Amino acid sequence: MSIEKNLELVHRMYDALNAQDLDAHDKYWTQDMIWHGPPAFGDIHGLEGFKYEVLKPFYAAFPDYYVKNDIEVADENWVAATGFLTATHQGEWLGIPPTGKPVKMRFSDFWLIKDGLLSENWVMTDDLEVMRQLGVDLLARRDKA
């Protein structure tokens, strides 16, 4: 696909993310997609797993989730982006009970596009910083050990 169409595909997928529309993702991803999560999260194989093991729990924890790319780079097969996700912690996330605190998460994403659909996604997020914003400072705990 063209660079413009690849960017448009990612933008439409982000619209679905921000609308928390799980079913809309069927239009943007291959059924056998692979989500390569941040360290310790592992990989999820398949669109249904991505929707119900990654997105749905995250939406439950952060129901006002909003993600925006600040920088995007693309070619005929790839799109890469970095930006910030903003949300309010209103449900359990990684064992942390709801705090009501706002968070700002730095992220980078890389998508491989095949046959006009997103087929793989490599995700890097600053989860330690988000935990710190929620009152859990893992590095301070390390220093006390």
Q: Predicted regions span which residues?
A:
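Short, surface-exposed coil-to-beta transition loops
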Residues: Y66, K104-S108
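A short, structured loop/turn motif at beta-sheet edges
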Residues: E72-A80, L112-S119
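Low-complexity, intrinsically disordered terminal/linker segments enriched in charged
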Residues: N121-A145
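A cross-kingdom feature marking solvent-exposed beta-strand/loop segments within repeated
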Residues: P39, G91-V103
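A solvent-exposed, acidic/Ser-Thr-rich amphipathic alpha-helical stretch
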Residues: A24-N77, F84-H89
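Short, structured motif recognition centered on aromatic/hydrophobic residues
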Residues: V10-H11, W35, S108-F110, L118, ...
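Intrinsic, low-complexity N-terminal interaction/targeting segments
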Residues: V79-T82, L94
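Short, low-complexity N-terminal intrinsically disordered segments enriched in polar/charged residues
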Residues: M1-Q31, L138-A145
